[in-house]
Amino acid sequence: MTSPKGKPSPKRSAPAPATAALTPCAEERTEGATSSASASASSHISSSFDSPRDDTVVLTGYTAESEHSAHGYERLHDIILQGSDTDADSEDGRANEDDVILFPHAEELSNAAAGVGGDDDNGRVVRLGTTQHLDESDSSEDEPTLNRVGDIPLEWYKDEDHIGYDIEGKKLMKKERSALERLLEATDDPNAMRTIYDALHDEKKTLSNADLQLIFNLQRNRTTNPNYDMYSEVQEDTVVFDPLNHPLARSGGPSKKAFVPALHDMKVIAKMVRRLRKEEAERRLRPAKEEKEEEDQLLWDDSHVEMDTHTHFKYFNRIPKPKLPPPGTFESYRPPPEYLPSERAKQRQARLRTIDRKEHFLPQSFDALRHVPFYHHTIQDRYQRCLDLAFFPRAQRTRLVVDPDKLLPELPDPKDLRPYPEKLSFHYKGHTATVRSVSVSPNGQYLATGCDDHLVRVFEVQTGRLMKRYDMGAPVQQVEFCPSTSLNILAVAVEYSLVFIVPTFAAHTLVNDHTIRFLRAPGLSAGQREAAHALGAVDTLGGRAVTQTALDADETAHEATADLHDIEEREKRAEFVDASAKERNAGIVVKIAMHAKVKKFCFHIKGDYLCALCPKDHVKYRQTIMLQLSKRKVFCPFRKFSEVVTDCRFHPREPIFFLATTNSVRCYNLMAHRLQRRFKASGGVTTCLSIHPEGDNFLVGDTTSHTSWFDMDFSDKPYKRMRSHKGVVNALAFHPKTNAYPLFATGASDGQVHVFHGMVYDDYNKNALVVPVKILKHQRPVYAVAWHPTLAWLFTSTEDGVVTAWTE
């Protein structure tokens, strides 16, 4: 017999007639009546319920896709009930309410299978749902299996053109049908709703009504025979119970309350249960104690000796005595010849005192060890050894092993912090001496350099072309472009003067005219300026002749300090001098004469104010001079200032002035005219100063190779102190656009320029991030560094006159 899914069923004994009537038989393929009955059933399966055959039940609305689901069988059951309503009403009441008859003539067929019918039906099996009558021996179990591949997965043949082999070893070829053919076949076939696919034989089989009834009963745990009574053999109890004659009934019986546990007992039991659970939980938490086997005690075991705490600690924490070093070649009885002392060495050893001798013997050579005499200092050496052990305490120190890499902070990879200058792109040649200063124009198109060969050179950044050269007549200390884009000013510090140049090629004509009007003296006509300049009679472009006159007058005034009429001369701070005709042709507009050599100066961000430093001025308050160019005003803000100044800077956003001295940085409020804060610069003498464009942080370089990062919101002491150079830090600078390029660079006398990534966060909970990213190397000491205003380019100058541009 074949299962509904097409798999061969195991062999079993011949069933009884009643059971055989309910076995699925749609798979049987026999000759004669079987073929004709199946053909006739298939031809009329699609007919309606108006004119059904007497021995055939027509099922509609059942699909093959739902043959394996409970929902499909429930739907099939409903269809069968609907089809049997009319016939059930016409019956004469033979069916009881307890009988399970799902379609017409089922009871009649089952009776025929059980032998209840007429004489003609004896000895024959009637299959439900058909009119086919077969012999009892004709069963699906006797039908041979065509495919003899055995009990193996049929998926093994899914890629083959056959499904197995028959009994003669011939291939059983697959019936190739496309999806369209299967769809049309399922549409045209009236038995498609009860047709299943036999994968073993690659054919379709139609389920009969009996097969469907059998599946329906098995799914609901019912017997296959609807007439089977499972309680037919149960014997009824014939004993009659008389409650009046029962012994418990006579006395009323025990009370039900006697069988209910007492409430007090329940509480006691619950308490005992809780105690047991608690002990069990504690037992699980306690570590399991390993049962130690009994061992023989050691007779001389010191661990079981009773002693006080101090003795116990000293005994078990004793430190072994240091061992004597093994004898060396010097103490050998046959040392190499170079170890044997000469006569002069023997005499020198004899002249030394005993306490001054390193060794109490001199090396000697013996032919054999038995020839070595007794060592006379044995007792002294042993005694000295005992003194060392007794009077020199031994201490045990725990050695702290720390990985040096773990002490370093976790910093991002420098490759992730690009762009930053890392390759040499331009050389600006022509300098014959030390270049002490470089400056880039506000638009980033021109580069100005100040050299000790008395020349100021202006180069075009992109091409390296020399645009203009100015002869100052003296070594140039510093050059700087005005940071304001509305003014085209190049300021130069030359010994005792500040020279203001208007490079006409660097800006538009309107900007140049506005700059010249800005620098001219207010209230003076052009003729008055010519007369004032003719009085000076200066022909050189430098400031030596102009400033020397002021210097001589100042020194003469200080020599006659007793004269009251020299007070006004001593109080003179600086003097504005208009340029001569020759100087104006060269681009020089005005010069400012100082009393001492100008070391450094800086512009305000708006370009109107300027501060100059003259640290060698013998008048202390004149070491720091502030100038207002538009009104030609000169004033010294620090009247009682005695420290030596090194650098100065204006705050980029607020009226705050930073002044660096030898050991500190002072922060002044220019509006309140008072000292706001003082930052202690630990280390050597400060050399340079740079302010962050945001104004809350600044850098200080000193002579001890340190670069200190100060955070004004953090403390008066350095937030970070970096020693990356091996020489004096001569220059440092922040990038003007730190929002786009958070970079700063330091240059030192060791010939190196270190580029750092310095990110300042707006969140006060985050500290500034400082990461070294690149080292740019030169052959000679670096004196100046300057950033491009819009790009991550760095310009440097060295002692040998090399000016370079490093690009990203």
Swiss-Prot record:
Q: Which Pfam families match?
A: BOP1NT, WD40
What GO molecular function annotation could you give as one example from this UniProt entry? ribonucleoprotein complex binding
Gene3D superfamilies in alphabetical order: YVTN repeat-like/Quinoprotein amine dehydrogenase
Any GO BP: maturation of 5.8S rRNA from tricistronic rRNA transcript (SSU-rRNA, 5.8S rRNA, LSU-rRNA)
> Where in this protein does the record put region Disordered?
1-55
Q: Which residue ranges contain the repeat WD?
A: 430-469, 640-680, 682-720, 724-766, 777-808
Cellular compartments annotated: Nucleus, Nucleolus; Nucleus, Nucleoplasm
Q: Name one GO cellular component term.
A: preribosome, large subunit precursor
Write down the SUPFAM superfamilies for this protein, in alphabetical order: WD40 repeat-like
Low complexity composition bias: residue spans: 1-25, 33-50
InterPro entries attached to this UniProt entry: BOP1/Erb1 (IPR028598), BOP1_N_dom (IPR012953), WD40/YVTN_repeat-like_dom_sf (IPR015943), WD40_repeat_dom_sf (IPR036322), WD40_rpt (IPR001680)
| UniProt keyword annotations, A-Z | Nucleus, Repeat, Ribosome biogenesis, rRNA processing, WD repeat
Lineage top rank: taxon: Eukaryota
| Database matches in HAMAP family | BOP1 (MF_03027)
> What role does this protein play?
Required for maturation of ribosomal RNAs and formation of the large ribosomal subunit.
Q: Which family does it belong to?
A: Belongs to the WD repeat BOP1/ERB1 family.
Q: What is this protein called?
A: Ribosome biogenesis protein BOP1 homolog
Please give the organism.
Answer: Leishmania major
Supply the source organism's classification: Eukaryota, Discoba, Euglenozoa, Kinetoplastea, Metakinetoplastina
